[in-house]
């Protein structure tokens, strides 16, 4: 019996180790997230654990966010607002790239913000549908508590103060994944990743509904 238990334990460790190596390989070569980097004037990256958000200047003490991070307490984004001598009410709009929990956790901290996204993503966010990726499907359906206040059309342009944001529907990572073009920067969320070589690669297959579809955009 003892030998059987040892054998089962070794098998479990092998499976877990192989799974970990597989996931690690999916992220190999990704460029690091540089907190505080500014890819364009009026655009600042904020690192929140293993993900990032972007703060976009909208003029007159107003900002918009691309995504809202993985921390429900929003420590990183609140610190960035404080650095600008702004409070939560300065956030007038949040543009969500998709509905996975690591990109929308702090939305509730900004009650004055309009929340933008595509209708195809709403079922994932309200729990009527679950993620479909090979790994994330095991997380099951979950109501994030986040709702869009404005549903976008593909190619729509939105104005927030002095900022204009053009929205594109790019299904693949999730059914309603979005890309946003603002201040000359294209924000792709998890639909693509920057590499150490200065190129981009497609969505990570393990967490994507349809990584082949994501590569078509």
Predicted regions and their residues:
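N-terminal Sec-pathway targeting helices
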Residues: 1-16
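Membrane-interface motif at the C-terminal end of an N-terminal transmembrane signal
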Residues: 15-32
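Conserved beta-strand hairpin/beta-sheet module of binuclear metal-dependent hydrolase folds
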Residues: 32-84, 179-191
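Alpha-helix C-terminal capping segments
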Residues: 46, 105-112, 178-182, 217
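Active-site neighborhood of phospho(di)ester-bond hydrolases with catalytic His/Asp-centered motifs
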Residues: 66-68, 90-102, 116-118, 169-172, ...
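Active-site HxH/HxHxD metal-binding segment of metal-dependent hydrolases
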Residues: 72-75, 82-153
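Cytochrome P450 C-terminal beta-domain/meander region
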Residues: 151-164
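Metallo-beta-lactamase
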Residues: 164-171, 175-217
């Amino acid at each position: 019996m003892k030998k059987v238990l040892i054998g089962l334990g070794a098998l479990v460790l092998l499976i877990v180790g192989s799974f970990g190596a597989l996931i690690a390989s999916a992220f190999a070569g990704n460029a690091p997230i540089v907190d505080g980097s500014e890819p364009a004037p009026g655009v600042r990256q904020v690192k929140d654990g293993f993900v990032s958000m972007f703060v976009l200047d909208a003029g007159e003490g107003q900002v918009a966010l691309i995504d809202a991070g993985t921390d429900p307490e929003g420590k990183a984004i609140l610190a960035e607002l404080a650095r600008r001598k702004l409070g939560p009410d300065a956030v007038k709009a949040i543009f969500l790239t998709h509905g996975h929990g690591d990109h929308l956790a702090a939305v509730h901290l900004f009650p004055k913000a309009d929340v933008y996204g595509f209708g195809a993503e709403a079922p994932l966010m309200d729990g009527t549908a679950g993620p479909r990726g090979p790994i994330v499907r095991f997380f099951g359906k979950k109501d994030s508590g986040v709702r869009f206040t404005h549903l976008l059309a593909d190619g729509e342009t939105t104005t927030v103060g002095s900022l204009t944001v053009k929205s594109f529907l790019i299904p693949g990572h999730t059914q309603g994944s979005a890309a946003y073009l603002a201040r000359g920067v294209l924000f792709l969320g998890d639909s693509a990743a920057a590499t150490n070589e200065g190129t981009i690669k497609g969505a990570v297959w393990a967490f994507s509904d349809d990584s082949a579809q994501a590569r078509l955009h």
